[in-house]
Design a protein with these regions (language model features):
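Pair of pore-lining "gating" transmembrane helices in MFS-fold secondary transporters
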Residues: 53, 167, 171-192, 196
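Short amphipathic helix-loop junctions that connect adjacent transmembrane helices
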Residues: 194-214
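Juxtamembrane intracellular "pre-TM" segments in multi-pass secondary transporters
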Residues: 142-180, 203
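Glycine-rich segments within core transmembrane alpha-helices of 12-TM secondary carriers
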Residues: 81-105
């Protein structure tokens, strides 16, 4: 869904100078559908799946809009470090959220409740923290672009801009190859991240709390890695940085498979 809609949403945001407004909309959508998972349980699998799909769609679309602000916030020679700061803060936010959820589950267990009974409430905690963390963006971030004239209507203009971009892509073969490669390696990374917790629980028999601790450790190392790698990216270049991270991913996956 994100792959199919992102080009049109991006064209619409550029034409209307609406990145911030769309980011607010996607943030609200992510918060609401994450919180809605609180109301799911046995017998509501379809509803839970729909909420997960919707929350991830809004989150992923919001990530694209956030990335579109980067050229406005950082000079080309500092994009790596600024991006690294952003990802590091995001991972620290994840640590805060997971820490709060882990504390809630521990408190529930101490009170004699089953862990499974307290898990739905962590959806509300996560949604609330995500909403609070987003507030500085909407209070202080400015939309620097100016709306463009739309003589043929905004929808027609967005489609026209998208068609022009696809047509011009033929003249930028490197960009086209990069976008295709990004599609595949991001899909692989997303699959690994999504299945990691499931693998830990089903194959390694991790409890819910063990899984949360694992995610806490992963987020902590990722925060340090993103912060440091941002500076490295500015020194060695973006292409080499991506190649280095993908080699690291491949190596770690092979080692995990052999373990």
């Amino acid at each position: 869904l994100i792959v199919l809609t992102a080009p049109l949403i991006g064209a619409w945001a550029d034409a209307r100078a609406a990145k911030k407004r769309l980011l607010a909309f996607t943030t609200v959508g992510c918060v609401l559908f994450t919180a809605a998972l609180y109301f799911t349980g046995p017998g509501t699998l379809a509803v839970a799946i729909a909420c997960v799909i919707a929350s991830n769609f809004f989150f992923g679309t919001g990530e694209n809009l956030i990335a579109a602000f980067l050229p406005e916030l950082a000079k080309s020679r500092a994009m790596g470090r600024v991006s690294g700061w952003g990802w590091s803060l995001g991972y620290l936010g994840g640590l805060l959220s997971l820490g709060a959820c882990l504390a809630w589950l521990s408190q529930a267990k101490a009170a004699g409740r089953e862990t499974a009974q307290a898990v739905p409430e962590t959806m509300l905690i996560t949604a609330a923290l995500f909403a609070v963390a987003s507030l500085p963006t909407f209070l202080f971030l400015r939309e620097r672009a100016a709306p463009q004239a739309q003589p043929d209507g905004i929808v027609h203009t967005a489609w026209a801009r998208l068609a022009a971009t696809l047509h011009d892509a033929r003249r930028f073969r490197d960009l086209a190859r990069f976008l295709v490669c990004t599609l595949f390696y991001q899909a692989g990374i997303a699959a690994v991240i999504t299945l990691a917790a499931i693998y830990a629980q089903e194959a390694m028999k991790f409890s819910t709390q063990d899984t949360l601790v694992l995610i806490l450790v992963v987020n902590l190392t990722a925060a340090f890695g993103a912060f440091g790698f941002g500076y490295l990216q500015d020194r060695i270049g973006h292409v080499r940085a991506i190649a280095l991270t993908l080699c690291g991913w491949i190596l770690m996956i092979v080692l995990a498979w052999l373990a």
